[in-house]
Each structure stands twice: as structure tokens, then as C-alpha cells.
Amino acid sequence: MAKRKHQGKPAPSDRNFGELTHKFKNNIYGTNKGKIREAVLQRDLHAQLDWLGHATDKRVLDVGGGQGQLALYLAALGHHVTVIDISDEMLELARIRANEAGLCERMRFIRAPLQEIAQLSLGQFDLVMCHAVLEWLVDQRSAIDLLKAQVSPSGALSLMYFNHEAHLMANMVYGNFDYVQKGLKVKQKVGLSPNNPIKQADMAAWLEAAKLTIAQKTGVRCFHDYLRELNKADDDFDALLELELKYNRQEPYASIGQYTHLMLIPIN
């Protein structure tokens, strides 16, 4: 098995990816990892939201929306989408893509951190999305309360976060024993490696306190990151994606995806 470099966990701090915008575009969004993520999120949203693509009056908020891949997809379905991100560079790329697609009239772009959502007075939304953001924040628990406050009583929260248990398991599979023994911590920050993976037990406690119930749990990249032959993801991607989508909502696979995607409903 090829030994892979572990993904480090630096000292806690919120993260702005402005300086890594093009690296994100090439190393995440344009890769098999990005394709799996996009396919999983689209499938899950359609499975849980019967109005998707039909009720064009529905409002969507994408927090930490980055370059706007999913936001553009939802705007193309006819929905009004507000994208919030802390990075000017990310938002500019999203604006360019929205303009090229003729979607600017249905999209709004705001530069702000998640922590300032309440101050923006945007009202509540039928769908709030926050994908791959929490693991970069210091105060993850408070972020969940802020997100829930933006969800309408009949709305939903789509939350995706970096899975601590899967991160540990993957590094054991890769043979990074020292890294695991050190508690998945390194001294130096790694560019695209999340700062704070989230434990499933912690997330469960936070959701209970926030009065959010899980309507659907999905693992994202349940198999991709554990492949012994790294070239298989490229050589037979369609088969890999089909199997990811087939099993990633079933346990135990749903709990070993590198990311966990939750569709959450507020308890009113």
C-alpha cells in the first residue's frame, strides 16, 4: 500500500482561503474527490427537498460557499441563492461563473464570516447550506446555533464536516502511526488540511442542544480514500462513484466517510 502523507491539525484558528483560491479550484473542485462530493450533495438535497427545482420562490443561503459550485447549481434550478464567504477571491470567481451562466439575477454575494450572519439581517431561508466550513473554525458549537437561526421553521440545514474518526482510520491505514499517537496533531499547518476534525459524539451533543434532528446521514468518500491502488479512482471512476452512492447512506459506511453530510430539520 502506498504510504500517504498525513493531513495535519495545526493550532486552532479560523481560516481564510483567499490565497489558496486557485489551489482549491485545481486540487479539490476539479478532482475525483470534488466530483464525489458534488454528486453526493446533489443527490442528498434532491432526496430530502421535494420542492427542489419546482418551487422557485424558495430561498437558499450558502455559508462559506466559496467558488459557488453548488449555489450555481441551485440557482440554475430557479431558486434565489445568497452566497456568503470570507474570501474576496472566492466570491469573485463565483460572480464570474454566475455571470457566464446568466444567473446573476437570482444570486447575491456577500463577503462576511459565518460569525456575522446575524448582523446581516437576511431573514430566514428554506435551505441553509454549510459545507466543509466547521472544521476550519475554533468555535464550532456556536456556529451551529448561528446557522440554525437562519433556517425557517419548515426549512432544512445541510451540514457537511470533516470526520475525526474517519481521519484517524485513514491515517492508520496509511501507516501514519506517530501522527495518530500524537492525537492527529502536527506543529506546522498544512495548506488544505482541516484544522479541527469533528468527532461524531461531539456533533450529536451539539445538535441535541441546538434542537436539530437528523433527517439523513451520509458519508462522503467512504471508499475513495481507502483504495489500495490509487490509480483505480481514475481508471474506473464511474464504478467507484456508483458504489459510493449505493452504500454511503448505510452503516457502517455512512460513519467512515472522510466527510459526514447531515440533512437537519429544526425541532420547533
Regions found by a protein language model. Name each.
Residues 2-55, 57-64, 69, 73, 101, 156-183:
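Conserved class I S-adenosyl-L-methionine
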Residues 69-116:
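Class I SAM-dependent methyltransferase SAM/SAH-binding core
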Residues 129:
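A conserved beta-strand element that flanks and buttresses the S-adenosyl-L-methionine
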Residues 141-156:
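A short glycine-rich, Lys/Arg-flanked "PGG" loop and its adjoining helix->strand segment in the class I
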Residues 194-211, 217:
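Short alpha-helix
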Residues 216-268:
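A C-terminal cap/extension of S-adenosyl-L-methionine-dependent methyltransferases
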